């Protein structure tokens, strides 16, 4: 088993082929597979585990002495939905999970390291400074997903995206193959090529331009004091298509309101699960805001119950964690003047709420798709949702559909107050983000599960060319959608038009060309590449080479 050498270069290297059958390295199965059990790096020869930023430089140089561009991948949390890290092409992995330093720099501000997870950084920022990143909730997802991937979460309506607060990054780049890698610090005020490199990290995705080692924030929002949380379960028994439309209409109306501290997660599980669930969260910072939040939830719940009476919580539902269900019957804390909050409604200190909702779900085989929505669902889409969440496809049983769902996340608010080109995240009009999900256990069920989610998605967007194209004019109007979310990658989008350029257009809209410019400057040899990585050629240049 590999150990740190006497002269520590800031990394260790694990030679996959050095073990023997009777004494295999116990780390290798974990080092060669991501969270999605569909993806395994079957041809990996070396794993470099880095512990210092300079070690990341050296590890990249050593890897490139043995491997060709495009066969070295970076891993942190390992939650990538597609095989962008673990596929048959990868020969070397640079694992940055040893980079976990965090703190405060007098010149650069708060910083967290790229090897840390959402939960690790939350504990540090909250414990030491009372600050938070307004990112997602899945505890084991690496910071690349929550920051450079354009992540968002329950505080995004109130504070915007994490990239809106990003002020600097420390990143290893290797623009010249024959020269040593360089550790650079670039920031919001950087100009020229350095400015393009910083901007590319404000949502341009991890593993595209170099190896990120640290993220810096000149300032961060203060943590809320607490959160009022409603956990509303609905039975499929007796539920109708029209009731679903009414419920979604109310949900969209709430998303358009001015209550930036209120956010929702609506997980519509397949009928086979027998129930589905809506979570509503309102954060507060003082007693006055707390009473307003409690009163708001009382009226929201009463309004929703006019459509359908909530049922008792029964069990934690499966799936890749968004904001995971609460435990059954947590202890209530009624300390306000009112006492009419439902049993499913809780008053949590912010730290406790974050602990409650930060699950990542079980490691399964999975497939995902996404869409940003500016307007309500057209009637035709309600019909499609009802069809695919109530019918059991050929080749699957009802029991095997229990972990299939459409997740409807509420956003807007401060996200809207940033220009589309201020960061690489161009989507600044959306109020809802959809995540289509399905999960299963066995490889022999891959094809039928993939067919179900692909058919669902294509039928949802059939009038728009099979994808949520922002530019397609139909009877319901233009601008219903704002493309797709890069952090929920979907290789099927490469089949839409112009290969991966079409997919990247849906992810980055008008920001794609500037990302291509940064790629050409800082990774011209495409060391870092995958099925949907940023290319070095524009679409016009690409077509000229075909």
Curated annotation (Swiss-Prot):
> What is recorded on activity versus pH?
Optimum pH is 6. A second pH optimum was found at pH 10.
Which Enzyme Commission number(s) are on file for it?
A: 1.1.3.5
Query: Outcome of residue 79 to K?
Result: Loss of activity due to the absence of FAD cofactor
Leading EC class: oxidoreductase
Give the top-rank taxon of the lineage listed in the UniProt record for this protein: Eukaryota
Q: Which residues form the FAD-binding PCMH-type domain?
A: 40-222
**Reactions catalysed:** beta-D-glucose + O2 = D-glucono-1,5-lactone + H2O2; D-galactose + O2 = D-galactono-1,5-lactone + H2O2; D-maltose + O2 = D-maltobiono-1,5-lactone + H2O2; D-cellobiose + O2 = D-cellobiono-1,5-lactone + H2O2
| Residues carrying sugar | 95, 358
Q: Do you know which PROSITE patterns this protein is assigned to? A: FAD_PCMH
Q: What does the cofactor section's free text say about binding? A: Binds 1 FAD per subunit in a bicovalent manner.
Q: Which Pfam families match?
A: BBE, FAD_binding_4
Q: How is it modified after translation?
A: Cleaved into 40 kDa and 29 kDa cleavage products, but the 2 polypeptide chains do not separate and seem to be physically linked together. The FAD cofactor is bound via a bicovalent 6-S-cysteinyl, 8alpha-N1-histidyl FAD linkage.
Cofactor names: FAD
Give the record's subunit note: Homodimer.
PANTHER family (alphabetical): BINDING OXIDOREDUCTASE, PUTATIVE (AFU_ORTHOLOGUE AFUA_1G17690)-RELATED, FAD-BINDING PCMH-TYPE DOMAIN-CONTAINING PROTEIN
Family, according to the entry, reads as follows: Belongs to the oxygen-dependent FAD-linked oxidoreductase family.
Q: Please explain the role this protein plays, according to its UniProt record.
A: Catalyzes the selective oxidation of C1 hydroxyl moieties on mono- and disaccharides with concomitant reduction of molecular oxygen to hydrogen peroxide. This results in the formation of the corresponding lactones, which typically undergo spontaneous hydrolysis. Hexose oxidase is able to oxidize a variety of substrates including D-glucose, D-galactose, maltose, cellobiose, and lactose.
| Name of the protein in its database record | Hexose oxidase
